[in-house]
Structures are given as structure tokens and as C-alpha cells.
Amino acid sequence: LKLDLAQFRAMEAFAMFASDLDAASRAQLAKGARLVELLKQRQSAPYPVEEQVVSVWAGTTGQLDSVAVEDVRRFEVDFLDYLRREKAGLLAAIRETGKFEDSTRSGLEAAVKDFKLRFFGQGGDRLVEAGTEAAPEALDDADIDQVQIVKQR
């Protein structure tokens, strides 16, 4: 993780002066940006160690490569919630043994694959079925609050 972030910072500094970047450099910059987003936590809301392990694993093994940088934090929060609700045994295994074993890795890979289907809306349980949402209503003039600012000289 530390090496990935160091490479990202170096590439980011180089990219400021370069106009054309090859695909590998762009991919490295995107991965670094995802890692930076992944490491952000709300103040006074630390994650348990097992959740930190899962988050770092997901970021460093390319599990987040298909997630847009601006969606990484939401993906992380939702994925950890999904693990707590439906795959609690994976988190418990890390917490109780203090190890990240092959069985845990394979279970997490399957969980990420399943969760991505739900997250990106391509299967799994959806909150609202496609095509059943109500059409949005137009706002009346009375529903819109406007304030006029007048500059006096």
C-alpha cells in the first residue's frame, strides 16, 4: 500500500507537466486516486481492524478498478455494510484468527463479485425494479423559493 501510494504521488507530480500519458500511467493514476479515497475516514468514526483489512485488500488487489473514483467511498461503505449483514463470517474469521487466509480471500472475491452486481444495478436485489419508478412531477412556481440580491452603490 505504501509503495502504491508513493508511486501514485510520483506519477501524479509527473503528470502535472506531461500532456500525453500512456494507458499504464493513466491506470496507475486512477488506482492511486482510488486508494487515496479508500483511506479517507470520517473523523471520530474509525473502522474495526477486520474492516480496514478488507478495505485495503480490495484497493490493493484491483477489486475497485471498475469503480469510479468519485464512487469509491460509497462503494466501500456499502460493501462493508453488505459484509456485516450477509457475510459476517468473513469478517469474524479475520477478527478471531488475526489472519487473512486463502479461504477468506476466496470468500471475499466471491462477495465482491456479488456486491458489484448489486452496486452497479446488474442483477441481485434491487431496491426499485427498473421501469417501476414514478415519473417526477414538475415544480409549480409556488414551490420554488427565489431570493433577489440587489447590489447598492
Predicted regions and their residues:
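Conserved catalytic/coupling modules of large nucleotide/cofactor-utilizing molecular machines
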Residues: 1-153
